[in-house]
Amino acid sequence: MSKKKILYLNLSTNEKDISLGFSNSWLSKFADKFESVDLISLNISSNNQTEFKNVNIFGISEPEKLSRIDKYLKLKNLVKDLTQKNDYSICFSHMSPLLSIIANWYNKNKKTISILWYTHPMPKELIKKIVLFISLFFNNQIVTASESSFPYFSKKVNVIGHAIDYDAFLNKKTNISNNNFVILSRISKSKNLELSIDSFLKSKFNQDSITVIGDAVTDADMEYKAFLAEKYKTKNNVIFKGMIPHKELPDILRSYSYHINSTPPGFYDKSVLETLAAGIYNFYLNADYDKHFDPKALKYTKFSSKQNTLTDLLNSVYELNNNKILEIVSFAQNSVSKESIETISDRVLSTVEN
């Protein structure tokens, strides 16, 4: 397969984006594999134009205020123009089924191989469900992070793991210096933050602190954030730190020893993988993370959504000695190295290489 040119589609190039601040690290790995990359993005940051030497950036810039129709027309014309002028071997769409459909519909070169990366539960809106389903027919391969992170069954779906900056987050711990808890998460009802916080407050760790790092994205998220602030306003050990730039997270995480993730199957959150790389002990709900732990350790890491299950688990770990905790952390830390950003382009492209 030729690796001269790739058409790369994504939602944002803004490193300050709450949900997609990591997307440029993905782009850089594909830029290393191809002679030239043409990027079409729905949100172009003003400082991106000179960041990548072999990447040409097109799309919709932050200051532009376009209607949905105007956005569609601009994207359609971009795809038509670029595919008429260039012979792309690959069209890769990162978390945008709609862009992948537009690109493939208007692509003049039908030999281009199309790959969609999608890692998320089933969309709630009917139109988004339909778009995601239709994208199955427009892409040669679908790549996703875990067994439950693509909501439709298809032989095209390939589970390849996630992509974290393992080397940046890596922190080999030799002791547990504190009992500080962190929840690294977008503030949203879907993340079950109350389950995590309430269970912590009822546990033997309740004299320690729990910090939520992350922020709201949608209007509904903002309402939920206000609700949480009101609910826990008398709890001085429940801290809402807000969003931290992704590049600063490795240093910030050094202050914590435990992380809770209460998201259900479908969410294969990078936060679990990043905190594991950072040497932080994890409590989780989604069985997709089981693969990163010694089977004998699952009774100390995985909980269910039933009442008091997480509290009981926290209490059992409270009684564990530090050596056992470090042993569990070390095993998981080594395992998540397989999901490093350094290998993401190879893992994606291997699904279409002969």
Q: In which residue ranges do the predicted regions lie?
A:
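Acidic anion/phosphate-binding donor-loop and adjacent secondary structure
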Residues: S67, P151, V159, A163-N179, ...
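A charged, aromatic-enriched C-terminal amphipathic alpha-helix characteristic of glycosyltransferases
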Residues: S304-T309, E319-E353
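Aromatic "clamp/platform" in nucleotide-sugar-dependent glycosyltransferases that forms part
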Residues: T263-P264
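N-terminal subdomain of nucleotide-sugar transferases
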Residues: M1-S46, L201-K202, I341-S345, E353
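Nucleotide-activated donor-binding/catalytic signature segment of Leloir-type glycosyltransferases, i.e.
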Residues: K225-I244
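Conserved donor-binding/catalytic core segment of Leloir-type glycosyltransferases
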Residues: L7-L9, K173-K191, I197-K202, T211-I213
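A conserved, positively charged/aromatic
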Residues: A31, S114-V143, F150-F153
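Short His-centered aromatic/hydrophobic patch
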Residues: F92-L99, Y118-P121
